[in-house]
């Protein structure tokens, strides 16, 4: 066999091996933790005992209840304390580390309760307050039917200073003011809409103190599109007292509507994106997870953090389908997006009902 023939054969064999390597991906080695669970990075093993502890002792056995709602709120109130011009460390845990300062900010009214609930877990486990806040929020959302696995990165350093005041948007702020504040932190108008999917599993305690634990939609224990549907219905009543700052009329007894949500659902800058979330569970899940991950990294250097996203549990499947509440029809929708028709939805059977408060509020 000539040298030229041998060379051609070697090249052919090399190409075949290269093709085979490309066709059969290498199996990624996973770390086995002390309790037998596995993760992509051994540094993430420290999270499994924390996961078990908060599921049992903070979230009442992995429920999607009041503590989940408040933990998710805390992720935002800590992280949005960030401005390139005004300062703030972002998602650094300052709202826990400097709680005597930040919980007294007017926009953080009522958040002292979840801060007090989380502080013992931070003290007990080897984790920074910034990491714990974002980890607890991600785990909490995963408890909700229809929820998402929000990416989680470990390794935030301890906060060195309190956030400045006036960085958290208020429910009585104008749309332009809210969008300007969020733009300052790096978020576009559509990303603001995506973040507000959090209100699908949220409630208000302080907007109307006479009715604590009043949810923003009729399914506060399910991560779904009902919030985006029901905020577009005509307001009929105040579920408690009237004339509360930051409150608009709600369509249902037992459901509260923030003035900011009412306006964002109808503003030309956000109305079409708002409507696009109706009955679009994959979009809600994908956009919310991506934007929450972005928010959780405000003020942080991602290259210095460890991706521990695989520790976050897989959420239960969505329960139920998008619908109009009983007693409503499409004529009750105050459609603000002229570009596309409002999705065709049917109403639940029966008369108009009342939404119960979130248990444990």
UniProtKB/Swiss-Prot annotation:
Ca(2+) 1 binds at residues 78, 90, 92, 94. Pfam families: peroxidase, Peroxidase_ext. GO terms for molecular function: heme binding; manganese peroxidase activity; metal ion binding; reactive-black-5:hydrogen-peroxide oxidoreductase activity. Keywords: Calcium, Disulfide bond, Glycoprotein, Heme, Hydrogen peroxide, Iron, Lignin degradation, Manganese, Metal-binding, Organic radical, Oxidoreductase, Peroxidase, Secreted, Signal, Zymogen. One of its GO terms (biological process) is response to reactive oxygen species. Residues 23-30 form a propeptide. A versatile ligninolytic peroxidase that combines the substrate specificity characteristics of the two other ligninolytic peroxidases, manganese peroxidase and lignin peroxidase. This is Versatile peroxidase VPL1. The gene is vpl1.
């Amino acid at each position: 066999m000539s040298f030229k023939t041998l060379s051609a054969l070697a090249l052919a064999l090399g190409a075949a091996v290269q093709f085979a390597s490309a066709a059969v991906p290498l199996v990624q080695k996973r770390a086995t933790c002390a309790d037998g669970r596995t993760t992509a990075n051994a540094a993430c093993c420290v999270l499994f005992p924390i996961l078990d502890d908060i599921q049992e002792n903070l979230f009442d056995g992995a429920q999607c209840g009041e503590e989940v709602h408040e933990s998710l709120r805390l992720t935002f109130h800590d992280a949005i304390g960030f401005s390139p011009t005004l300062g703030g460390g972002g998602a650094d845990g300052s709202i826990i580390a400097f709680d005597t300062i930040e919980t007294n900010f007017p926009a953080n009214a009522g958040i002292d309760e979840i801060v007090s609930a989380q502080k013992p877990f931070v003290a007990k486990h080897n984790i920074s307050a910034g990491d714990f806040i974002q980890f607890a929020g991600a785990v909490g959302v995963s408890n909700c039917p229809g929820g998402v696995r929000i990416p989680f990165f470990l390794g935030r350093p301890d906060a060195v200073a309190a956030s400045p005041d006036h960085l958290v948007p208020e429910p009585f702020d104008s749309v332009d003011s809210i969008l300007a504040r969020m733009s300052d932190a790096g978020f576009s108008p559509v990303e603001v809409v995506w973040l507000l999917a959090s209100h699908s599993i949220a409630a208000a305690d302080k907007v109307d103190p006479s009715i604590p634990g009043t949810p923003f939609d009729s399914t506060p224990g399910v991560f779904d599109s009902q919030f985006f549907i029901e905020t577009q219905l005509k307001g009929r009543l105040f579920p408690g007292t009237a004339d509360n700052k930051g409150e608009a009329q709600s369509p249902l007894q037992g459901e509260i509507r923030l003035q900011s949500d009412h306006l964002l659902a109808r503003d030309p800058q956000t109305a079409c994106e708002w409507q696009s979330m109706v009955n679009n569970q994959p979009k809600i899940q994908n956009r919310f997870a991506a934007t929450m991950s972005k928010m959780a990294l405000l003020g942080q250097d991602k290259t210095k953090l460890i991706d521990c996203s695989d520790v976050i549990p897989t959420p239960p499947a969505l329960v139920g389908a998008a619908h109009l509440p009983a007693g409503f029809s499409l004529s009750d929708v105050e459609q603000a997006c002229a570009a596309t028709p409002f999705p065709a939805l049917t109403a639940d059977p029966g008369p108009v009902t009342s939404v119960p408060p979130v248990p444990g509020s």
